Amino acid sequence: MNIVTSNRIFLSQVPDKLASDEPFIFWDTCALLNLVRIPLIERKELTLNMLQSYEFLLNEIEMGHVQSIASEVVLSEFSHHVDNIINQLHNQEQRIKDEVKSQTAYMANAQQANVISQKIEFLDVSNKVIKMVRKIWQKTYILRGQKSFATNADYRTRNYITPSRGKESYKDSYIWVSFISLLNKLQPTEICYFFTANPADFAVDKKTTTLHPDLATEMPA
């Protein structure tokens, strides 16, 4: 996937480029990848209700009601994984189309079977989610990497500090450090969202959305 981004900013540019009195969403990689994964049948935990939530978010971003921000690491991770997911979507879609056409061939009404076979060609949820994620990236500010992010993330990883507790997870730490650095620089007065689909790393446990207390203490007052 060719990802178009035009809003790349350094931390020092944050006060000039972003509004402190407007809400923003800061994306974790898995949250964006899961949008593309929604049509995959084997991902039973991803539902069409989730697609509606992403549609709502995209609309809020496009209307200028919510600022969209991601770390440079998130962009890199997303780019590394998304093409494989898209290939899975296309393969699954073709299998479904072939199966439906095969089933309709046994229908008594040949004309009706032909109509259904033609309509199935327009059932393309895969293209819908791909278009949506492209639009999100087009409207997203990319927070460029810098040495302080890397140094902090390395320290957290080596000392197993959340979100690297119990494992070496440099990228998760880097993304979190980027988010906290952004908050400290912008000093927002409106609500801010850290959107992750990986609560096992950032929440109390994988069954809750409550921020891990180690991370909660780092949030600006």
PLM segments and residue spans:
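Active-site-proximal, substrate-binding regions of enzyme catalytic domains
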Residues: 2-192, 200-221
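Cofactor-binding loop segments of dinucleotide-utilizing enzymes, especially the Rossmann-like FAD-
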Residues: 197
